[in-house]
Amino acid sequence: MVINMKWEENVRKVVPYVAGEQPNRPNMIKLNTNECPYPPAPGVRKAAENMESAALRLYPNSNAQPLVDELAAYYGVKPEQVFVGVGSDDVLSMAFLTFFNSGKPILFPDVTYSFYDVWADLYRIPYHTCALDENWHMNPEDYKQHNGGVIFPNPNAPTGVEESQELIEEILQANPDVVVIVDEAYV
């Protein structure tokens, strides 16, 4: 007996994420999968050596409160102004669910981080992609149309092009009533 769950229809519409080619060479550093080309800093090594290994078998604090408190103190904000997740994709997922639910299309570049359309499809968020120019830059005029939010990486993935502060400010000023996310995962 086959039971169709309500959520199946939504999930079946999502095109699976396909990772780019992953060469299997021992000395290759894959920046596209966030591998770091540098060894851990001496302070990190020392902290790891001094870490109580028994704690590694336990789940961390479920709301990461110690980390949230430290980040809030460091940046001079209240802890309730800090959000952490289990990776950037988790944070992006929560951002899409939280901020992009007006029914209006969100905007992002046509050549960009490949998970934006996956999240939009999964959460049934309409979207419109905006073409980059011949030098792989965003055209701020494209982001002045009626929308339900804007998201773009800076620098862009996969082009590596970094937009100017002036362009970002122009997009922010043109969108005072929606959330604009400048995804700086690759800074």
Residue ranges and their predicted role:
Residues 56-177, 181, 186-187:
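Conserved core of the PLP fold type I
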Residues 2-58, 146:
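N-terminal "arm"/small-domain region of PLP-dependent enzymes with the aminotransferase-like
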